[in-house]
Amino acid sequence: YLYDRCDEQGLLVWVDSPLHRSSFLGDVAYFATPQFEQNGIQQLQEIIAQNYNHPSVVMWGIFSRLWMRGDDVTPYLRRLNDTAHAMDRSRPTVACSDQNGGLNFITDLIVWRQDVGWRKGSTDDVAVWRNQLQKNWSNLRSGVCYGGSGFIGHKSYTAQTAPRSNWMPEERQTRFHEEYVKNLQNDSLFWGTWINNMFDYGSARRPYGINGEGLVTIDRRERKDAYYLYRALWNERKPTLHIVDKRRSLRDRNRQAFSVYSSVGAPTLFVGADTVAMTQYAACQYRSDSVEIQGIVQVKAVAGEQCDSVTLRVGNVLKPKRQPVPRRTAGPQQTN
């Protein structure tokens, strides 16, 4: 059903074979046995045979974020790559990698899974990585994918240097995507840019049983700020004007700065009765200087026929008390 809809809507599909990292709580993903290898080749053959006639399918995935542990996996990856080419010479092969080594030179296309600046360093370090890739490996047909967790129910009052396993505010995810877009958008080095997940999804390995890297919540009801960033950048059919951090309607500091995503030109920002100047930070991203506000204030952004607004309560705000998160134990976990 999904591929049929992609055929109708003109969405491009990358179909993956199930060779990923390692099994849950396992150390290796590849076992050098004839049975293991033949099973993987058969699965790839069946995937190609079942989806060959879908015009939306444009590439065959060979592996994803494979760990280089145990036996050398590169001969097996070459067999998988040759199998895909033998069955379908019209489509390229692709892989997603976050490792160094020979496995990155096997498929026709390679997509780099990147997260510099999420747990270590600065998000600006992705520009350093990009420049090194341009200098040393520009012969590779490279794409890039990235993402970070953010929960709309988690609010941050101060900048955090690193995410915590049980406290991942949406604001940090938003800033991560903003900086990556600024550094990588429309870079000719990359043939494509991929976001890790469109939707949050259930994961037994994550706090709360949810992987929060999506742009939309697990129940599909709430769109995160990062969603509107990419809608402004990538959706030419639907105009976007969005004030960032609207869910943080209670703020304890009197000096506030605002960000707006706009695909319809520079917005005009009204804070109460005042007009606040905005400057373009990056493509479709606009930021204001900090302004002094107090009490209940309406903030409104206007650009052409588009308008977005939010009402804030500023000053003397009690910070929400964090609820203790119980330690995870063995056994099935609730995801919603």
Explain the meaning of each model-derived region.
Residues Y1-L140, G150-I152, A159-T161:
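Active-site mouth of glycoside hydrolases
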Residues I41, S56-W60, N81-H85, V94, ...:
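Substrate-binding clefts and catalytic carboxylate motifs of secreted carbohydrate-active enzymes
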